[in-house]
């Protein structure tokens, strides 16, 4: 499966679209012809429909690119004429619900939504006829003839649809759309399971008494998922292996390549006796299985919708309608024979590792997303079948079956597991914050979007020895420290750290650093193999801005150049020597720019970064040793006293930044096992420093706890191959089958 660039995700809100658009009857009549009529016949039978439209409406039942219209008839009739006579059915106030596919275009900056006439999809979801007449044959005649009338005026339907202002939302990054977790696989994988387990009905047989002399029998080949639907609607192809259809004295032989395309919904069923175990939990929860829904939905739509019957041989229009009506009745009566379990959840389960309890689901949902065809053929590898969940009894305010269809392309694999970023922040990124030891956890709040933390009070950041040989406090004011995820990167940002650097100089420094999360496997410096280690990696030079007042600039050559040089060189290289040479201050002076507020600003750039790294070589291992000593204080002094002791222990600005960075990295590595135990963090910092990666904890235990409560029916195990931040915390991998 080739990796594709991710387009924007367009989320259609048909509830809001329906509620916020009220199309008048006058507008409707201006576009849609009032009268409709259609007739078909053969030597045995003629069927005619005629009537007048009352109104068409867009409903709120659509999913993804597939809106549903309700077309209401004012008056009319269906007339069936055969050798036994005539029969007339009233259409007064009858209705039909139809589904079609729309496409999106942008013309001169304006969003345009229209029915895809070139690749037209148009089928009946439900109607009022069957409940009234209880006759699937009459139902099929009415459905097909009304759809034919609408299809004849498809351009008018398109004009009518364009009266609606379609409400959508755009997501650039991947999204779980309010769900805490999502576990996805491809249609291809699901189809392999269906084929192997063969839980679909193998045979079909149906006879009907009455004037049409219908009987049908035959065998199905393996049913399979196909594209053409989104959300809760799941499309299947039911290939016909062999069989025959007899109607009105005519025999039609089925052949290979013919099929019935149907649409189903699924539901979760409580299971009293669990059928699988989660090796990472106590298995004290309740199991639910995702199976075919066999009754009407909340909109009273039947469990099975016949989208189309594909035939290769010669059969007239009446015969095909009779066949469709017969299949409609058979499928709705026999769909409970489709025993496939699509997924199973253990809900409300207890994790063996309390630090991973937050990964255990408490509510389950499902959804599908169809990928666009490739060369006219369904793209089953990129089409997504997903099971979503909430954890810790969290609530999804707008629960939806909508699935981000880009997720498999993003991992370039057959399966993916995602965690909503604010949940990742609260449960994993917080370990990095806590281990930095710049404040107690209660000194920080979640930022409004849930993507990180911000300090809620003034913090004593550290104690620095200044140019006069004095130990002075360095502060960070409220809201000036942020640890967050932005642009799919981890970011540490301190807007202003300030301290009295000399009698005439107050140091003001803005510092930020970005990190990527990388999943690494390989051989470490000792020759030992390691696998699936998640490590934060600096992805660029840090951002450093030093502010200098006009008075301070006047003494640049004597004092400020050396002081600022020490800060910059220390941050960039880790070199903490007291003698830099006059050339460094002179070199940095050329990067000073004056602001409109009368201050001078020194911003580090790549040229400066490379120049200083070539000039100075610091021993960064010293900082890791200090970081380890500071983490050990948690065990001896406790968290609060350790933070206070560290903040009041004299150091310098550069050392403080480097040590905090080491502790942050150690905290995140420790998060792989859900732990902020000092011994684990110390071990992580030491191994990371020495590039002894085989000693670091892998992400495997986390992955096992993440997916352990969810089971695909083919007893497959998720084998992780990638991890990244991409709107969500995203794990990609393969599903490897194993024997029970």
From Swiss-Prot:
P.bifermentans strain Cbm (subsp. malaysia) is toxic to Anopheles mosquito 3rd instar larvae and less toxic to Aedes aegypti larvae. It comes from the Bacteria. Belongs to the TULIP P47 family. The keyword Ion transport does not apply. The gene is orfX2. This is Protein OrfX2. Induction: Part of both a high- and low-molecular weight complex with other proteins from the ptox and cry loci. Encoded in the ptox locus, possibly in an ntnh-orfX1-orfX2-orfX3-pmp1 operon. One of its GO terms (molecular function) is toxin activity. Pfam families: Clostridium_P47. The keyword Disulfide bond does not apply. Expression of the ptox operon (ntnh-orfX1-orfX2-orfX3-pmp1) in B.thuringiensis kills Anopheles but not Aedes mosquito 3rd instar larvae. The ntnh-pmp1 construct is about half as toxic. Keywords: Plasmid, Virulence. InterPro entries: Clostridium_P47 (IPR010567).
């Amino acid at each position: 499966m080739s990796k594709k660039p991710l387009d924007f995700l367009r989320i259609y809100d048909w509830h809001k679209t329906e509620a916020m658009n009220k199309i008048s009857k006058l507008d409707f009549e201006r576009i849609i012809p009032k009268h409709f009529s259609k007739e078909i016949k053969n030597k045995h039978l003629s069927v005619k429909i005629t009537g007048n439209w009352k109104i068409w409406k867009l409903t709120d039942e659509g999913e993804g690119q597939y809106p549903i219209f309700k077309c209401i008839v004012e008056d009319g009739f269906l007339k069936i004429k055969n050798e036994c006579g005539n029969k007339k059915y009233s259409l007064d106030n009858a209705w039909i619900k139809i589904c079609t596919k729309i496409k999106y275009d942008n013309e001169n900056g304006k969003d345009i939504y229209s029915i895809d006439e070139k690749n037209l999809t148009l089928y009946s979801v439900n109607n009022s006829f069957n409940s009234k007449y209880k006759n699937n044959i009459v139902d099929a005649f009415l459905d097909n003839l009304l759809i034919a009338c609408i299809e004849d005026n498809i351009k008018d339907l398109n004009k009518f649809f364009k009266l609606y202002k379609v409400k959508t939302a755009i997501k650039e990054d991947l999204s779980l759309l309010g769900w805490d977790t999502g576990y996805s696989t491809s249609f291809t994988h699901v189809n392999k399971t269906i084929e192997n387990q063969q839980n679909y009905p193998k045979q079909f047989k149906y006879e009907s008494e009455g004037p049409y002399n219908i009987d049908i029998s035959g065998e199905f080949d393996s049913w399979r998922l196909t594209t053409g639907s989104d959300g809760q609607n799941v499309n299947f192809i039911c290939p016909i292996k062999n069989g025959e259809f007899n109607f009105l004295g005519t025999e039609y032989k089925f052949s290979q390549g013919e099929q019935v395309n149907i649409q189903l919904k699924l539901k979760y069923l409580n299971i009293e006796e669990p059928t699988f175990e989660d090796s990472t939990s106590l298995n004290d929860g309740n199991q639910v299985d995702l199976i075919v829904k066999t009754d009407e939905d909340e909109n009273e739509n039947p469990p099975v919708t016949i989208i189309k019957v594909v035939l290769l041989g010669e059969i007239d229009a009446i015969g095909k309608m009779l066949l469709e009506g017969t299949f409609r009745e058979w499928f709705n009566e026999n769909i409970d024979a489709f025993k496939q379990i699509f997924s199973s959840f253990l809900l409300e389960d207890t994790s063996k590792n309390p630090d991973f309890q937050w990964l255990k689901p408490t509510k389950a949902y499902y959804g599908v997303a169809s990928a666009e065809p490739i060369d006219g053929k369904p793209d089953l590898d990129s089409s997504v079948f997903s099971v979503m969940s909430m954890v810790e009894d969290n609530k999804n305010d707008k629960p939806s079956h909508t699935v981000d269809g880009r997720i498999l392309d993003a991992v370039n694999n057959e399966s993916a597991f995602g965690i909503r970023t604010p949940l990742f922040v609260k449960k994993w990124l917080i370990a990095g914050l806590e281990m930095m030891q710049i404040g107690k956890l209660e000194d920080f709040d979640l930022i409004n979007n849930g993507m990180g933390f911000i300090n809620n009070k003034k913090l004593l950041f550290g104690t620095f020895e200044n140019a006069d040989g004095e130990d002075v406090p360095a502060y960070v004011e409220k809201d000036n420290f942020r640890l967050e995820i932005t642009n799919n990167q981890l970011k540490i940002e301190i807007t202003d750290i300030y301290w009295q650097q000399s009698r005439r100089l107050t140091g003001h420094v803005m510092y930020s650093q970005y990190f990527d999360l990388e999943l690494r496997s390989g051989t470490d410096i000792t020759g030992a193999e390691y696998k699936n280690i998640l490590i934060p990696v600096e992805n660029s030079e840090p951002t450093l801005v030093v502010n200098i007042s006009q008075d301070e600039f006047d003494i640049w050559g004597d004092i400020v150049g050396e002081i600022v040089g020490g800060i910059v060189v220390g941050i960039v290289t880790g070199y903490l020597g007291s003698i830099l040479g006059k050339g460094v201050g002179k070199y940095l002076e050329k990067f000073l720019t004056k602001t409109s507020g009368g201050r001078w600003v020194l911003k580090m750039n790549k040229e400066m970064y490379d120049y200083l790294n070539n000039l100075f070589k610091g021993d960064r291992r010293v900082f890791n040793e200090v970081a380890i000593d500071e983490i050990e204080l948690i065990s001896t002094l406790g968290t609060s006293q350790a933070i206070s002791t560290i903040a009041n222990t004299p150091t310098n600005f550069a050392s403080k930044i480097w040590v905090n960075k080491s502790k942050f990295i150690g905290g995140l590595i420790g998060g792989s096992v859900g732990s902020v135990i000092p011994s684990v963090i110390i071990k992580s910092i030491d191994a990371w420093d020495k590039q002894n990666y085989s000693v670091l904890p892998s992400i495997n235990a986390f992955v096992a706890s993440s997916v352990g409560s969810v089971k695909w029916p083919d007893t497959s195990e998720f084998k992780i191959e990638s991890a990244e931040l991409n709107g969500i915390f995203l794990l990609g991998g393969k599903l490897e089958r194993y024997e029970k």
